[in-house]
Swiss-Prot record:
Key words of the record: Plasmid
Superkingdom assignment: Archaea
Stated name of the protein: Uncharacterized protein MJECL09
């Protein structure tokens, strides 16, 4: 199975769009994200893995809407999961979403 991966953050919008053959485990994504953000003086991180069956449907639906606006793909049934991070420093919030979308039309 092939995957499209999208990365979005609250400051820059969409910054990465890639195709991969494998998923990145949630734990690996957390480690990579903290590594990238640790020099930015954030004091608290909140991570969650969102799926269509998640308890936090508000966040899932919000992030899905952002992805829909960015792409012309029919992603409604193809989003496998969303990794979500909110990093905080005093009163500033920095939000990151990493999307894993099943890519059915990708030719090798």
């Amino acid at each position: 199975m092939n995957y499209m991966k999208f990365m979005w953050n609250s400051e820059d919008g969409f910054i990465v769009e890639e195709q991969h053959k494998e998923e990145i485990p949630f734990e690996d994504w957390i480690v990579n994200t903290v590594e990238q953000l640790k020099n930015l003086q954030y004091t608290r991180y909140t991570f969650e893995e969102l799926t269509p069956k998640t308890k936090n449907l508000e966040a899932y639906n919000k992030l899905l809407e952002i992805l829909k606006k960015h792409t012309n793909m029919d992603i409604e049934n193809n989003v496998k999961r969303i990794y979500h991070c909110i990093a905080e420093n005093n009163n500033y919030k920095y939000e990151i979403a990493f999307y894993i979308v099943i890519s059915k039309n990708w030719n090798e």
